[in-house]
Amino acid sequence: MGGGSRFQEPVRMSRRKQVTKEKEEDENFKSPNLEAERRRREKLHCRLMALRSHVPIVTNMTKASIVEDAITYIGELQNNVKNLLETFHEMEEAPPEIDEEQTDPMIKPEVETSDLNEEMKKLGIEENVQLCKIGERKFWLKIITEKRDGIFTKFMEVMRFLGFEIIDISLTTSNGAILISASVQTQELCDVEQTKDFLLEVMRSNP
């Protein structure tokens, strides 16, 4: 009877060791998985915060709301670009208006806005670029240039090349001139004077 008990005790100890070893192996297996999951969640959180920083209006801080607001904002930007391109193409294709009563070639027609009118009085049709900083990485841009084929397309290409994101934009035209006003932002540091000089040089060059 006593000998049987002494025989069973080593068996129990062996089983305990086996169970303990299996638990340790299971913990060692779970640990890398938990670390990988933690890194994945951190990366996802960082990407969501980066996405949120580009969206001007966020209705809620939940993941689903941030993604939904970003999709809505991207759709609005795409529609704005589409409408602007359509408007500009229509302006390029439209024949110039001629005032039959205006016989003096030195008399310039009235422009569409007082702002453009003041600029035209000072500079005529000469190209002019103004770039003002309105935030840490946000700027207000105004360009006056000659109205010619492909000028708006060139402007959009240059802004993409410089790394600017267009937040808001408007176009105003008069006979022979176009005013582009835009609110833009960039993720990179921007030298205002160098950027102005580069834009002015590009706007003055042939399309």
Curated annotation (Swiss-Prot):
One of its GO terms (molecular function) is DNA-binding transcription factor activity. SUPFAM superfamilies: HLH, helix-loop-helix DNA-binding domain. Residues 28-77 form the bHLH domain. It is found in: Nucleus. Pfam families: HLH (PF00010). Keywords: Developmental protein, DNA-binding, Nucleus, Transcription, Transcription regulation. InterPro entries: bHLH_dom (IPR011598), HLH_DNA-bd_sf (IPR036638), TF_AMS/ICE1/BHLH6-like (IPR051358). Residues 1-38 are annotated as: Disordered. Mostly expressed in anthers, and, to a lower extent, in young inflorescences undergoing meiosis and siliques. SMART domains: HLH. Disulfide bonds: none annotated. One of its GO terms (cellular component) is nucleus. GO terms for biological process: anther wall tapetum development; regulation of DNA-templated transcription. Homodimer. Transcription factor. Involved in the control of tapetum development. Required for male fertility and pollen differentiation, especially during callose deposition. This is Transcription factor DYT1. It comes from Arabidopsis thaliana. The gene is DYT1.
